[in-house]
Amino acid sequence: MSKQEKSNVEDKSLDIETAAQVETAQESASGALEELSVEEQLERAKDTIKELEDSCDQFKDEALRAKAEMENIRKRAERDVSNARKFGIEKFAKELLPVIDSIEQALKHEVKLEEAIAMKEGIELTAKILVDILKKNGVEELDPKGEKFDPNLHEAMAMIPNPEFEDNTIFDVFQKGYMLNGRIVRAAKVVIVKN
């Protein structure tokens, strides 16, 4: 082999080595780029997961709030229906109370004629039926004579001194009071003792 051929072979060897080195460097650089790209992809994936978790938490919170709101609406509706059942007759009962008062006033009068006695018994029976119907529907009578005065249940119409009774004791009842399922329909009008 001539010198020139030898030189060409050496140049080709060098070119092959250089090409191999360049290729190895490119592969290393490409691998580094791929590694960097994988790390970036991992960071992006972590960021996406975090965003999705935050969205999921927000949706869970909104769902819990909606569930709580629906539960509150259901309870409010049940309470409204219950109150409508309990107090639906309140206006009607209030309008009947003067009728009961009138009947009771009429029954206080003493009668002597036999026909009037029979009529009074019929009125007493009618009054009893009316009061029983009201009781059956949750209306209770308040006849607080002798009890302690309670401004939530009683309306003081007058005060009288009486050493036989303690202060704020109900001495007399002008007009009975009525409650409907624990709610005052009409306060009892009373006379209380004030010494």
Curated annotation (Swiss-Prot):
Disulfide bonds: none annotated. Its main location: cytoplasm. InterPro entries: GrpE, GrpE_coiled_coil, GrpE_head. Participates actively in the response to hyperosmotic and heat shock by preventing the aggregation of stress-denatured proteins, in association with DnaK and GrpE. It is the nucleotide exchange factor for DnaK and may function as a thermosensor. Unfolded proteins bind initially to DnaJ; upon interaction with the DnaJ-bound protein, DnaK hydrolyzes its bound ATP, resulting in the formation of a stable complex. GrpE releases ADP from DnaK; ATP binding to DnaK triggers the release of the substrate protein, thus completing the reaction cycle. It comes from Francisella tularensis subsp. holarctica (strain OSU18). It is found in: Cytoplasm. The gene is grpE. This is Protein GrpE. One of its GO terms (biological process) is protein folding.
